[in-house]
Structures are given as C-alpha cells and as structure tokens.
Amino acid sequence: MKTMKRVKTVTARSSDFGKWYTDVCLKAELIAYSEAKGFIIYLPYGYALWENIQKHLNCTLQKTGHQNVYFPLVFPEKLFHKEKNHIQGFSPEAAMITTTGKKNLSEKLVIRPTSEILFSQYYSKTITSYRDLPKLYNQWCNVVRWEKTTKPFLRGKEFLWQEGHTVHATEQEAMQQTLSILDIYQKLGKNLLALPFVCGKKTETEKFAGALITYSIEALMHDGQALQAGTSHYLGTNFAKSFQIQFQDCDHQKKYVHQTSWGVSTRLIGALIMVHSDDEGLVLPPYVSPMQIVIIPLQPQDDAVKQTSENLFSILQKNYRVHLDLQDKTAGWKFSQYELKGVPLRIEIGKRGLENDEVTIFQRYNFAKQNIKTKDLPSQIPQLFETIHNNMYQKALQHLEQNRKQATTYEEFKTYLKQGGYVAMSISGTDAELQIKQETGATARVILETNLITANCPVTNKKALQTVLFARAY
C-alpha cells in the first residue's frame, strides 16, 4: 500500500478567512480557475452540488405548476432601452457582442445579465386574453455580469442560476406568487442546505432595478458578513407598460399584466461553504452532498473486509449516494481526503471490528465516532442523516442569533458593526441609509416587520419610519 502525505492543507479560517475560503473551493475540487479572469470551471464535485439544488427546486416548482423553458443568451441592444430603471441598474456591467470575425455587427447584442427583457418581449407577442394567464415559467441558465471584483461562487463574471418569470392578471395574484417563492427559498435553505435565512423586504435603494418591491433571503457567514442568497421581485406593471403586455379580461377590458421575477444562484454553494465548513475543509449537510457516504476498508486485501465492504455498498447504493474506496492508499490519507471533501458519513470496516460484527461510523460535522452492528447500519442511516442535518441547521441558527443585535444610538451601531453580524436600527429613510453606507460600509439587508426601536433616527435625528437590518456584506 502506498504511503502518501496529505498535501492539500487548508489555511486556518481564523488567520485569513478569504484565503481559507479559496483553499476550500480549490482543494475540495469544487472549482478551478479558467484562462479568462473572473470565469470559473465547475468541476464534477462542485457541479454535482448545483445539480442537487436543481433537483430539489425543480421538484418543488413542478408541484406549484411552473414549467421550465430556455431563452436565448443574447438580445438586441435596442430592447435594453425599453425599461429605463432596468437599464440604469444593469448597463454598467452588461457585456455586449459587437463583432463577428472582422465585421462589426449592424446591431449590438447584449449578453443577458438577467432575462426580464427577453421574457417581457416574448409575453408581449403571446398574451392577449385572460385565458392566457397565468404564465409560470422558469429557466436554468448562465448569466454574464462584468464584475470588477470576483470570488468563486459569490461573485463572478459568469454564474449559474435559475430565474423565474411569471405573468398574472392582478396585483394580488402576482404578490401572492412573489411571497410564495420567498417561502420556497426559505424552505430550500432549511430543508436541503441546513441554512437559516433572514427574509424580508428590501429598501428602495437596494431593490432590483425595475421592480416595485424586492424581497430577499439573507444568510450570515462565519466571518460575520451577510450574503444575499436569493431574491423575489414584484415588478408590477413596469415592464408590461414598457413592452405593451396587455390582455383582454372577461369583461372585454384591456389591462396591463402584473409580473414577477425571482432567482437563486450558485451563491448558495458559497453560503454552504462559508457557514458550515471548518479548518479541515468542506462540511456538507447530507441531503445536498454529492457523496453522502464513503466506505473505507481498512485492510482491503482481507477477504472478509472486502466482502463486507462490497455487500454494504450494494445495499446502501440503492438509497444513497455512496462511494466504496478501494484505492491503493493508506486509510489515513483517505480519511483526510474525504474530510476535506466534506462527506457527511464515513464507514470504516476492519478486521478487528468484524470480529464483533461491527463497523465504525464517523460523522464529518462533529468528528464523532461510534461502533455499530453491521446488520443495524442500513436501518439507522435515515435517523443519522436527520440528526446531522438538524444539528448543522441549529448550529448555523445559533450563530445567526448570537450575532444579531439592535442599536439605539449611532455610536452603539458602529460598535456592534465592528463585531460583525447583523445590527438592527430604526432610521428615517434613504438619507440615513446612504449616510450609514458611506460612513461604515454597511448596507441595508432587509426591512424588519417589527416595532420601532427608537422614535427618532440615531443618524439624522429625524422621525424614525422603519427598522432596518444592516450588515457588511459580500
């Protein structure tokens, strides 16, 4: 058997959080850098994470009547100018195709930064009657935004996402859709990713370009910074009026449709890493992990060990994503590698344990080991996974709650902000929000539906109108 040292050491999280994060992404083989700056290669293990998110969300959206479609990567530049707020929001980072070969294109093509324009143009041609409504479309695709600063999964010039675009007859139906999707995203975090989200309405400054109302799901990373993990927008009739999307109602009256758009992206993978992982590498919740179980024979040349390992693999692979490692490498090397890759459950099978008809199981999230009867293992895995998932969620929730404070003075706000995490404060409006951003670097994450903390805004001394949750964010 080959003796190999583990060479993929991960930077300590406490010494350099940014380097630690990059190490985990690269050394757990989630991504690789490409030759084009700001564009990453999704390696099999990283892409499998995204596929598992896709499967979960697709299943939910199919039950709610949504249909998957695919729209083109590009659209003519002239369409970009139809919705003025939208173009102001996305023009700075929009990439365009201007030439083909040595010829200039007669009309520039915008590479989609998001697809409201494409969907609205299509809907304007196909919706005429109330019988055509609602339209509940979703697409899985890539988008391109020319970001200045990039970070794997969190911010890139190209990223993967799903974007839903729905059309409704009334404001009430569209708002119901907007909030329903927000609930779906929150449950995706809790039930698949073991991620607690703070959900709420965005301020006017932070809302989506072209939307009337934006809601978001916000996660708190281990370093105390927030991450916007998904959004759901009520677009009202803004795009409908710009693109003339009208329908005739049952009373033969012409009306503008009400639209929504919403999406989550590969940012969810970044959140998974930053919330759950540790100095040994990736830590993954069992339901989303590409490899849920790894079986490691401690003496693979021993017939009994090998046979037991293969039998157990045969049983478990019917219900789980399981891998049997028969590589000619030391058990210690294998342990380190699968800990680095965050595999939730490791099963160690050795001669000594088999004398008592036992195997050893190792849980990645808390490093707990225990012996268990071989015959009992398959029936106990569902409960093990449920316990692992719930404990990971509770740990993340505890971190969120312990790093959520409220301030009654601006100085108190600044002190809390330096400690990291969320800080709630009642403010007078956009003037206070922009001053806070300029002076502290904190941004408004969501508006809280709670009572005012103070009657006056600690920043402007004007009457407080709303309580907002602030944080420094990715």
Curated annotation (Swiss-Prot):
Record keywords: Aminoacyl-tRNA synthetase, ATP-binding, Cytoplasm, Ligase, Nucleotide-binding, Protein biosynthesis
GO biological process, one term: prolyl-tRNA aminoacylation
Compartments, as annotated in UniProt: Cytoplasm
Signal peptide positions (record): none
PROSITE patterns: AA_TRNA_LIGASE_II (PS50862)
Disulphide connectivity of cysteines: none
Pfam families (UniProt xref): HGTP_anticodon, ProRS-C_1, tRNA-synt_2b
Enzyme class: ligase
Catalytic activity: tRNA(Pro) + L-proline + ATP = L-prolyl-tRNA(Pro) + AMP + diphosphate
Gene Ontology CC terms, in alphabetical order: aminoacyl-tRNA synthetase multienzyme complex; cytoplasm
UniProt-listed Enzyme Commission number(s): 6.1.1.15
SMART domains registered for this protein in UniProt: ProRS-C_1
GO MF: ATP binding; proline-tRNA ligase activity
PANTHER family the UniProt entry points to: BIFUNCTIONAL GLUTAMATE_PROLINE--TRNA LIGASE (PTHR43382:SF2), PROLYL-TRNA SYNTHETASE (PTHR43382)
Physiological role: Catalyzes the attachment of proline to tRNA(Pro) in a two-step reaction: proline is first activated by ATP to form Pro-AMP and then transferred to the acceptor end of tRNA(Pro).
Name of the protein in question: Proline--tRNA ligase
The organism of origin for this protein: Onion yellows phytoplasma (strain OY-M)
Lineage, highest ranks first: Bacteria, Bacillati, Mycoplasmatota, Mollicutes, Acholeplasmatales
